[in-house]
Regions:
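Catalytic cores of the polymerase beta-like nucleotidyltransferase superfamily
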Residues: 1-476
Length: 476
């Protein structure tokens, strides 16, 4: 948290920077108000980066466009119907929106757009008080009609008006509360939590895409556990990702098993800790985080208490992969993300067979082949999945995975594991067996791939010999 003086210095530096100062002067000259609003003002006090800038104005969209166009490096009006014009001004990307005074009908997913006449009125209709502050330009006057600055210093999340009215207007704000709790490390006011519990059914009118986008922002925060727990505790998760609260299985004192819900949140935390060190991208990894959160969602459907009292979850990896695919599809995730997450969930138990008894080289090759481009993520997920408090067991599992990674590296040097292919390609198979393209060529290819996985590189001559023997048996 920055001091007021430090935050004001940051805001003044931004307000007096060349593109923003020039923009403000143009709006004033045209007889309109302009203010920096929302996230950038909040983030100046929190010491967070000031990237994309949100501005509010008394000007209508056509006027905004006319004022901005001559000085913008680029501009766009995709949000024009909602009063928003976007522009790039030097190093800054800005969105300039006409003051809003929207209303919401009871069953509608979309607001009835109405433009307002005052900055204060615009701020009071925003989601939370800490987001309802503005800096008037060019005067650099702070406007805080609801007490957002007090909330920032108290690390408290509260709505400008009644939480019930706010969430009734836009139910997505309930998910935003969970996201901000995690993203900004703030405590959600008890009146807001109670309203989330009362109003949770209203989230059903929010489009799947908006829910998805908010869940993604939550998961990509530095510490999403707090926000996810809030969604579960208020009952909102039952409506947006019911597989998560379903993990709160009753723990029988005689049939011991992990608290699957708490375990899943811990796996997510541990995956986040590992991703920075293990994965090449500097950005948070959405696929890994989704897989970590959802890796055990097949357990409720597969829980069995055996005759001796032991609890089992046989095939929860396969069941969980199917459930993840279904949920992520319902939330309108892209096909690539859905495929990657469900595949990681399907593979997440594979290593634990290795920890019991080391595999042959063939088993190691198959592990690499099955993971393919997801191998590094699978390494992270598998390591994160060890949450035992038994230090001896934890050390044994960690050592076993270290050994597996060493074997993968050694075989990779010898055999180019990550680009594993049979010794003959499709063209060679067709030429050798005098075949035309068709299903039998695929069968032959898979036969040679199995040989390659079992034994490593055969060489073309040996591959040709075995292929002829296989083909003779297949067609004879």
């Amino acid at each position: 948290m920055q001091s007021v003086a430090e935050a004001v210095t940051r805001l003044e530096a931004l307000a007096t920077s060349e593109p923003l100062a020039a923009l403000a002067e143009r709006f004033v000259a045209a007889g309109h108000e302009l203010a920096l609003v929302g996230g950038p003002v909040r983030d100046a006090f929190l010491g967070r980066p000031l990237n994309d800038l949100d501005l509010a104005t008394s000007a209508r969209p056509d006027d905004i466009l006319r004022i901005v166009k001559p000085i913008a490096d680029a501009h766009w009006d995709i949000g024009r119907a909602f009063g928003t014009i976007g522009a790039r001004l030097g190093a800054h990307t800005v969105e300039i929106t006409t003051y809003r005074a929207d209303t919401y009908s009871a069953g509608s997913r979309k607001p009835e757009v109405a433009f307002g006449d005052s900055l204060e009125g615009d701020l009071m209709r925003r989601d939370f008080r800490m987001n309802a502050m503005a800096l008037r330009l060019p005067s650099r006057t702070l406007v805080d009609p609801s007490g957002g600055l007090d909330d920032l210093f108290a690390r408290r999340l509260m709505t400008p008006g009644s939480p019930d009215d706010s969430f009734d207007d836009d139910p997505l704000r309930m998910l935003r509360a969970a996201r901000f709790a995690a993203q900004l490390d703030v405590a959600v006011d008890v009146t807001v939590i109670e309203a989330m519990e009362r109003m949770r059914g209203r989230v059903s009118i929010v489009s799947a895409e908006r829910v998805r986008d908010e869940m993604v922002k939550l998961l990509l925060s530095a510490a999403p556990r707090r926000g996810l727990a809030l969604l579960v505790d208020t009952g909102l998760a039952e409506l947006v990702m019911p597989e998560l609260p379903a993990l709160r299985l009753e723990v029988d004192e005689h049939a011991h098993h992990k608290d699957v819900y708490e375990h899943s949140l811990t796996v997510l935390e541990q995956a986040i800790e590992l991703e920075g060190a293990r994965l090449t991208s500097e950005a948070p990894d959405l696929v890994l985080r989704l897989a970590a959160l959802m890796h055990d969602i097949g357990k409720p459907a597969t829980k069995r208490v055996e005759a001796g009292g032991a609890v089992t979850f046989h095939h929860h990896d396969v069941v969980g992969a199917k459930l993840a695919r279904k949920r992520l599809t319902a939330l309108r995730f892209d096909k690539e993300t859905i495929t990657a997450v469900s595949r990681l969930i399907e593979l997440h138990l594979r290593f634990f067979g290795y920890s019991d008894a080391p595999w042959t080289d063939s088993g190691v090759r198959r592990y690499v082949r099955d993971a393919d481009a997801l191998l590094e993520r699978l390494h992270v997920l598998t390591r994160a999945d060890v949450t035992t408090r038994n230090r001896r067991k934890e050390a044994r599992l960690r050592g076993a995975y270290d050994e597996l990674e060493r074997r993968i590296a050694a075989l990779a040097e010898q055999e180019e594991l990550l680009a594993m292919r049979p010794d003959l390609d499709g063209e060679q198979i067709m030429a050798l067996l005098a075949l035309r393209p068709g299903p039998i060529v695929g069968e032959a290819y898979r036969f040679l791939l199995e040989q390659r996985l079992d034994e490593g590189p055969l060489g073309e001559a040996e591959a040709e010999r075995r292929l002829r023997v296989w083909f003779a048996a297949r067609t004879g």
